[in-house]
Design a protein with these regions (language model features):
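Long, domain-scale functional regions
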Residues: 1-190
Length: 190
């Protein structure tokens, strides 16, 4: 299902976004190909609609990559960002498809490693009212922790993400793999 995150939707991001949530919403889209049957490498899922922009995530794993090859947790200099996503991956798309991707100001200030936060609390710290002013402008990013939290059925939005194991069957983002997020730990710099 798609949920409109207004201030009247309990425990939501309250940012007027539209987000898909639940076990298996029909939120698939083919990006980077015009083939009649979408190649698996071009299959994405819509996280949500934020203003006039649609945020996508690959439907399957992109592979095993390090967030960074050095002991540094700054997104602007991470190898996953500069080398892989906004490097190899982006340059592998034709200019037609590259031009469909908006340059976005990603909030990358990070947050303290807090195991007792809900999706809304993570949202506020990552990109909402309590977020850092540190941004990074790029076409490709990663999901936020709160994106994962809000992809579960709304029944879980009051659950601390540390205890999200029971939500796996009702969270379309769960692919039973560890995944990187763009949110770094602000507790240390490496």
């Amino acid at each position: 299902s798609m949920y409109y995150h207004t201030t009247s939707l309990a425990n939501s991001a309250a940012d007027n976004s539209y987000r898909y949530a639940g076990a298996n919403p029909n939120n698939y889209v083919c990006f980077g190909s015009t083939a009649s049957t979408c190649p698996s490498g071009n299959l994405y899922r819509i996280i949500g609609v934020f203003g006039s922009e649609v945020k996508l995530i690959k439907a399957t794993s992109y592979g095993s990559y390090k967030w960074n090859s050095s002991e540094n947790n700054t997104w602007s200099s991470s190898t996953l960002n500069a080398g892989t996503l906004n490097g190899t991956y982006l340059s592998g798309l034709s200019s037609t498809w590259q031009n469909k991707i908006a340059t976005t100001n990603w909030k990358v200030g990070g947050m303290s490693q807090n195991s007792s936060a809900t999706a809304k609390q993570y949202y506020d710290t990552e990109i909402g009212s309590s977020s850092s002013s540190t941004t990074y402008s790029a076409k490709i990013g990663l999901m936020y922790v709160s994106d994962y939290g809000f992809a579960a059925s709304p029944d879980y939005w009051t659950t601390e993400l540390f205890n999200y194991e029971p939500s796996k069957s009702s969270n379309w983002m769960n692919i039973n793999l560890n995944e990187w997020t763009i949110s770094r730990s602000s507790d240390n710099t490496n």
